[in-house]
Amino acid sequence: MKKYKHFKGGIYEWVCSATLESDPNIQMIVYRAANGTIWTRPGSVFFEEVEHQGQKVPRFALIESSIN
């Protein structure tokens, strides 16, 4: 299981990656919030750096990675 911390503080669990049907070149990341809500966003956005408090930081930073 992989867990990521969003730059605003939320913790999310990686569910899977998927190919967008309408454009097979786009990899979508599927992830779950602590309250169970499922979210998805393009991999290019999930893994990008954003500006936060004057610094470039990852949108999602890996905080836990384990093999089940």
PLM regions: where:
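Mixed-charge, low-complexity intrinsically disordered regions
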Residues: 1-68
